[in-house]
C-alpha cells in the first residue's frame, strides 16, 4: 500500500479521537416492513439499514445524534417523511433531571419492598402500571401501616442498642487511656434514629445520616460537675468541649474496627452514623479488562435494616444462560410470545451481539475522559437476594448512556422495574460524569408521539427530541404542539410555534405510564433477516444520478482490504455499474451525513 493510501486509512482511524480503531459498514439500503407500533398489516414502516461488525463508540455516538439506532449489529434509521410512525430520538440531560411524583413513588415502592413492607406481585395480579400509587395503598393496607411501622421500629431497636454499646466501650477505652478522668460518673450512651427534618441541623451534607448520639454533651456536663466539686481546681483550664469529646470517642471506636454498613463522623459535638456504599471491582482473570462491576446493596444504602438485598452488577455484553432463561419468561409472559418463536440465536442477535469496539478505562491518552467501566455494550443485572430479576441492555458512549432494552421477571411486575432501572441509569450518568466530563446524557431510544406506550419517555423531564432535518435538539415542551398537529414535523422550525404555548400546566397532562423502557416492540426481535434487509426497489437512483459527483469523492471505501477514497478508485469500464455504484454512494452519504461518510469505511459486498 502506498504512503498516500496508508495515510488515508490512518485518517479514518484517528479522526475520532484515536480510540477504538475504525468503523466498517455495509449499506443494506431501504427496508419496508410491517409496523410493530401501529400494527399495520401492510409494509408502511420504512427505514434505511446498515450492517456492521465493527463500529467505534465515537462513530456510533455521531450516528445516534443523527437519528440512528442499533439492533445487535444492524443499524437502522427511519425515513421520517415516509414511514408510518415517525420515530424521534429522545434524550435527557442527567444533571437537569427532575423526578416526577410518580417516579419518586417508584423509588419508595422499591424501598418498601426491600424493607419487607411490600411483596412483589406477578403480572396477572397487577393492574395497569400507570395507576396512581394511592390505588396501590388500599384501605386494608392503610389499616396495617401502623402495625408495620411498629414492627419496623422493633427491628431497629437492636441496631441502636448495639451502636450504644460500642460508644460505651469507646468511653471505657478513653478512661483507661487517661483521656477522660476516671472519677467521673459518665452516663450510658443513647443512640437515636434521625428523621429527615432534623438531618440538616445535625450535619452538613447529611442526606445519608441514619443515627446520631449526643453522648458528648452529658459527658462534658458530668466532667464539669465533678471538677467543680474539687476545691482548688481550675475548671475552665481542664474542660473539654463536646467537639473534642466526640473526636476522642470516634478515635477510640476506629481503633476497635469498622462499623459494618456505616460511616461514622462527628459534627457539632454529635456522633453521626451515615449509610455506607460498598463498591467493588468484579473478580477477573489476568488480562481481562476492568469492568467496574458495582455492587449496590440498596438504592438508599440502608444496609442495616433491609430484609431483602438488592444488588446491581455491570458487565460486558455476553451470553449467559441465566439471562436467556429470564428473557424467555419475559417475552412469553409480558409479550405473549410463543415458545417456538424464541430462540437462542435471535436473542443473541438482538441483545448480545454488538459491533461496538470495547474501550477500556486505561491505556489511552484521554483516560480522564473515559468512565471506570470503559465504553461499549453492557448488561446491567439487578438481583434480589442473588435472584436475577432484571437485565438492562445498555451502551455507554462518550456523551451518553443509551438504554436499548430491559427484560424482567414477571413475578416482580408490581415493582415497575422499567421505571426504576431508568432512574438508576440516570443516577449512573450523574455519578460517572465526575470522572468523564463529556458523559452528560441519558438516551431513551425512539419516541413516537402517537404511541401511548412511548409516553413514559417524555415523563423524564426535561427531555429533548432530535429534529429529523437539521439534527438539532429541541425541548419536548416546544416540540409537543408540533407533534400534536402531525406525526412528522421539522422540530427546529420553532419560529412557527412560540415556546410559551406549551405551558408547565399542559405538560402535567402527559400520561406517566410505567410501561417498561424498551426501544422496540417485539416485532423487532423476531424479524427474519431476509425481511429486515429486503431492500425496496423504489430507490432514489434516478435523482441521485444527477447529483454532482464531487459530493461522494471523499467517501472511504474498502475494496477487499485496501481503503481508498472514491476519487482514487479507477473508473469502471461498464458505465451502468459505475452509475449504480454512484447512486448507492449518494444514498449512503445522504443517510449517514457527509462527515461520517468520510470517516467510516464503506464496505462493498
Curated annotation (Swiss-Prot):
Enzyme category, top tier: transferase
GO molecular function, one term: arginyl-tRNA--protein transferase activity
InterPro entries referenced in this protein's UniProt entry, alphabetically: Acyl_CoA_acyltransferase (IPR016181), Arg-tRNA-P_Trfase_1_euk (IPR017137), N-end_Aminoacyl_Trfase (IPR030700), N-end_Aminoacyl_Trfase_C (IPR007472), N-end_Aminoacyl_Trfase_N (IPR007471)
Biased composition (Low complexity): 496-513
BP GO annotations: defense response to fungus; regulation of lipid catabolic process; regulation of seed germination; response to abscisic acid
E.C. code: 2.3.2.8
Listed PANTHER family: ARGININE-TRNA-PROTEIN TRANSFERASE 1, ARGINYL-TRNA--PROTEIN TRANSFERASE 1
Pfam family, one: ATE_N
Originating species: Arabidopsis thaliana (Mouse-ear cress)
Domain of life per record: Eukaryota
Compositional bias ranges of the Acidic residues kind: 518-541
Catalytic activity: an N-terminal L-alpha-aminoacyl-[protein] + L-arginyl-tRNA(Arg) = an N-terminal L-arginyl-L-aminoacyl-[protein] + tRNA(Arg) + H(+)
Function description: Involved in the post-translational conjugation of arginine to the N-terminal aspartate or glutamate of a protein. This arginylation is required for degradation of the protein via the ubiquitin pathway. Component of the N-end rule pathway with ATE1 and PRT6. The N-end rule pathway regulates seed after-ripening, seedling sugar sensitivity, seedling lipid breakdown, and abscisic acid (ABA) sensitivity of germination. The end-rule pathway regulates various aspects of leaf and shoot development. Involved in the oxygen-dependent N-arginylation of RAP2-12, an activator of hypoxic gene expression.
Family listed: Belongs to the R-transferase family.
Region (Disordered) residue spans: 496-549
Protein name: Arginyl-tRNA--protein transferase 2
